[in-house]
């Protein structure tokens, strides 16, 4: 058998395998913020679906700790274990985009870490994470923007 036929067969197999996996584990775009039209099962008032290696997950955990909010941490495996839990059948029911973190507050999922930070801060204004002075608020905004990793293009900052 000619080698070009073998090569085309192997390439076709890998392309087809990739397309099948992509179809089986498809994700959907979501908008950030509280999802009033969605609900998720919950056991605790606050449940954070996150990964310890995720920058966005860590900043949400820091905000929850800083505000003194009691929450249940649900570790979602990414690439470090090879299980790719964000592409499993379970996690996309919580967040159809397959991205972490997701905060579930009494059954309502909240997507996008910066939106989660705003939500957390709005819960108790007596101990706000955002400074009162306009200059300090602007400084916080600059840092949030600098540290933002948009889910639409998480690797875009490398360009």
Question: What does each model-identified segment do?
Answer:
Residues 2-159:
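GST-like domain detector, emphasizing the conserved glutathione-binding G-site
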């Amino acid at each position: 058998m000619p080698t070009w036929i073998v090569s085309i067969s192997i390439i076709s197999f890998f392309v087809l395998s990739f397309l099948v996996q992509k179809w089986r584990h498809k994700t959907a775009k979501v908008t950030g913020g509280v999802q009033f039209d969605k609900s998720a099962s919950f056991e605790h008032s606050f449940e954070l679906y996150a990964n310890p290696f995720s920058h966005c997950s860590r900043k949400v955990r820091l905000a929850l700790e800083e505000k003194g909010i009691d929450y249940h941490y649900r570790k979602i495996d990414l690439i470090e274990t090879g299980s790719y839990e964000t592409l499993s059948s379970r996690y996309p029911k919580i967040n159809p985009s397959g991205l972490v973190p997701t905060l579930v507050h009494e059954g309502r999922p909240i997507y996008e870490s910066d939106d989660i930070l705003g939500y957390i801060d709005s819960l108790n204004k007596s101990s706000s994470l955002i400074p009162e002075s306009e200059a300090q608020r602007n400084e916080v905004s600059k840092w949030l923007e600098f540290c933002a990793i948009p889910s639409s293009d998480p690797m875009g900052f490398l360009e």
